[in-house]
């Protein structure tokens, strides 16, 4: 089967790249409108919808936050600038594995919440307790997670809720209350997913 001239194929590929332009991608305002990457396209419409991954360390310069992965989706392009909205976050698998050791107990909680200004989110919390704990203690810790997360959703708008979750402030409050039940190693908001935005 004829494959065509390799030089022509290479030239065609090169021409396609020549037609593309680079767009500078920016984080939302509550993450400081910081530049988070570059993305190429031959049409600005093709940039819309792309998801850019970065870390909280890259945004803040805090080297202790490299495990916090942030996802931003491009929704608007003006000139060579692409603007994003927060899509979700996760903790790296390697970081979670480092917390969960033998003779510890991992308590997970998954909560669908609505922020004060109407954003619907799925929030996944996690508490790591030293040693094995009783089922009743697990249940009590999960209740603490739920109560704090729901209370925050009632009190905070979307932007403030996200910031408290990804920076660790919310997890610190969970840890403080959970320690009244049993000594714990760590509390984390391990994942957030935006389910729906309020109707305009």
Swiss-Prot record:
PROSITE patterns: RIBOSOMAL_S3AE (PS01191)
InterPro entries: Ribosomal_eS1 (IPR001593), Ribosomal_eS1_arc (IPR030838), Ribosomal_eS1_CS (IPR018281)
Record's keyword terms, sorted: Ribonucleoprotein, Ribosomal protein
UniProt record, GO biological process: translation
GO cellular component terms, A-Z: ribonucleoprotein complex; ribosome
Keyword Transit peptide assigned: no
One Pfam family it belongs to: Ribosomal_S3Ae
SMART domains: Ribosomal_S3Ae
GO molecular function, one term: structural constituent of ribosome
Disulfide bond positions: none
Protein's UniProt keywords contain Magnesium: no
Family statement: Belongs to the eukaryotic ribosomal protein eS1 family.
Protein's recorded name: Small ribosomal subunit protein eS1
């Amino acid at each position: 089967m004829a494959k065509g001239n390799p030089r022509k194929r290479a030239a065609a590929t090169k021409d396609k790249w020549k037609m593309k332009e680079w767009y500078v991608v920016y984080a939302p305002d509550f993450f400081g409108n910081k530049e988070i990457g570059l993305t190429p396209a031959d049409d600005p419409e093709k940039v819309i919808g792309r998801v850019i991954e970065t870390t909280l360390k890259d945004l803040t310069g805090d080297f202790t936050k490299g495990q916090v992965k942030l996802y931003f989706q491009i929704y608007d392009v003006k000139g060579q600038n692409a603007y994003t909205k927060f899509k979700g976050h996760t903790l790296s698998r390697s970081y979670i594995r480092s917390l969960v050791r033998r003779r510890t107990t991992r308590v997970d909680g998954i909560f669908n919440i609505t922020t004060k200004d109407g954003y619907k989110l799925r929030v996944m919390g996690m508490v790591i307790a030293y040693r094995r704990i009783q089922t009743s203690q697990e249940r009590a810790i999960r209740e603490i997670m739920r109560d704090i997360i729901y209370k925050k959703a009632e009190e905070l708008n979307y932007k403030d809720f996200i910031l408290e979750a990804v920076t660790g402030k919310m997890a610190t409050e969970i840890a403080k209350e959970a320690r009244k039940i049993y000594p714990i190693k760590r509390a984390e908001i391990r994942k957030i997913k935006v389910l729906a935005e309020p109707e305009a």
